[in-house]
């Protein structure tokens, strides 16, 4: 994965206005997850990073669940833009 790849899911103006929005938080978690995943491909025994990755995955999952309950249309758009798999339902 290219280190400087940028996910342009939310426009620059929206980023300046809505830094606390659910979509922006999910975007930031996704960027951190991809960066940590590429790090763990090189450093397989970095267990602290693995733990951090699992924590971030859980936080992003909770935010995605919240967004899907509040606004299903925005949830579907965001998943499509960020290329995230839809979670399995229990």
Swiss-Prot record:
SUPFAM superfamilies, A to Z: S15/NS1 RNA-binding domain (SSF47060)
Record has Plastid as a keyword: yes
Domain of life per record: Eukaryota
One Gene Ontology MF term: structural constituent of ribosome
Keyword set includes Chloroplast: yes
Localization of this protein: Plastid, Chloroplast
One matching Pfam family: Ribosomal_S15
GO cellular component term of the entry, any: ribosome
Keywords for this protein: Chloroplast, Plastid, Ribonucleoprotein, Ribosomal protein
InterPro entries: Ribosomal_uS15 (IPR000589), Ribosomal_uS15_bac-type (IPR005290), uS15_NS1_RNA-bd_sf (IPR009068)
Gene Ontology terms describing biological process: translation
Assembly with partners or alone: Part of the 30S ribosomal subunit.
Family: Belongs to the universal ribosomal protein uS15 family.
Protein name: Small ribosomal subunit protein uS15c
Native organism: Piper cenocladum
């Amino acid at each position: 994965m290219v280190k400087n790849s940028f996910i342009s899911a939310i426009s620059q103006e929206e980023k300046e206005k809505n830094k606390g929005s659910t979509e922006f938080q999910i975007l930031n978690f996704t960027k951190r997850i991809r960066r940590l995943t590429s790090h763990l491909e090189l450093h397989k025994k970095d267990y602290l990073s693995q733990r951090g990755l699992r924590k971030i995955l859980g936080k992003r999952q909770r935010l995605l669940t919240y967004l899907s309950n509040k606004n299903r249309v925005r949830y579907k758009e965001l998943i499509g833009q960020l290329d995230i798999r839809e979670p399995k339902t229990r």
